[in-house]
Amino acid sequence: MRRLLWLLALPLVLALALTAAACGGDDEEGAATGTGTGATGTQASGEPIKIGASLPLTGDFSEPGVAAKQGYELWQEQVNQNGGLLGRPVEIVIKDDQSDQNVVVADYNALIQQDKVDLLLGTFSSLLNIPASAVAERNQMLYVEPAGGSPEMFNRGFQYLFFAQQATAPHQADLFVEWVGGLPDDEKPKTGAYVIADDPFGGPVAEGIQKGLEAAGVQTVYSEVYPPETKNFDAIASAIAAKKPDVIAQGSAGLEDGVNLTRSLVKVGYNPKQYFQASSPSFADQYSNGVGAGNTDGVFYALSYHPEAETPGNTEFLEAFKAKYDAEPAEDAADAYAAAQVLQAAVEAVGSIDDQKALADWLHANEVETILGTLSWDETGAPEQAFLLAQWQNGNEEIVLPEDAATTDTIVNPKPDWQQ
């Protein structure tokens, strides 16, 4: 759910994507499973099915890009160990888009026109997926992407685009908003402050929270958009402290913004009753080390994936990931694996890779069970579910909502004081 920065180059990139040269099953109701495992014990044979993707393996966004690569490659390995896709081995061709919009457009054009891939998987972030998905749409190829929840992804009338997480950016914090709205009057915040990144993903998260909390009766006392190059949040923290809001919500796209705002709030000595941050707290130890372990307690954030989630295939995925990489999967790795599961489910249901429209039509009409849970999509390719609501508690990351997925019965409220 960590998404990247908006650049002014996007109109040019979209123009390049949309002028690129074009290349050249029955629906079934119910939930299909993209398991990462085909017909167990069956040897894949024949010409490989080539799946193309470009990821930010270098540049500013290399950390989530490398994690996504791990997810894709684990899925490929498991599929090939268990009979392949439609009985054929899978070959994933991954290019490095260098965290650059122009490069990602060139990469997907090359994958389609030169590498002659049969299928596509998406890149990381709304920033890169907006132009990349335009290349896929122009070429009438299914485009399942693991990390691009900006509203701008879904307002273009695309038929082949699908986002393989639970919800789009404006709805990332729906469970937080619902929880706040349901608090007793003596616990419910009266005033709110919103720190909004100028970013196609992070901005809509904070704006969605503000809209929801205002509808719940929370008065807005501070709401400002900050530029993506902001490093020092001291002035923002001081302005917020002067307004004394009960709840603070930040919408950003990565680790650094959230860490720096928290440090500044600690510095000015202002502690809200409730504190929600998009993206940053999900960076686990990097967030904890950045803000200080004692300053994580009570911080809310949204998650697409948690290692302890009781979702279909998650236990097997977790074990396989640890065995292959000797580490727990990052959220971005799980998101990429789930995107591949969605692609697999469509191909297996249709029984062919020759009709991309049939694959898209099947996904529009059906649900798919993944390690993130059951996913379904509206006519724009936007998902229709809800993210998990998580909270840092005593140095641990806990799922607090929904109740049937919670790893604890406790929600820390109000937030404990900062530890200087």
Language model segments and positions:
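Extracellular/periplasmic periplasmic-binding protein-like sensory domains
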Residues: Q166, T262-Y337, A349, E403-Q419
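C-terminal motif of bacterial Sec signal peptides marking the signal peptidase cleavage site
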Residues: L18-A22
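Bacterial N-terminal signal peptides that target proteins for export
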Residues: M1-L10
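Signal peptide-proximal N-terminal region
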Residues: I49, Q70-I92, G182-E187, E214-V218
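Beta-alpha junction/loop-to-helix N-cap segments that form part of ligand/metal-binding clefts
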Residues: D27-A31, T35-T40, E63-A68, G83-N155, ...
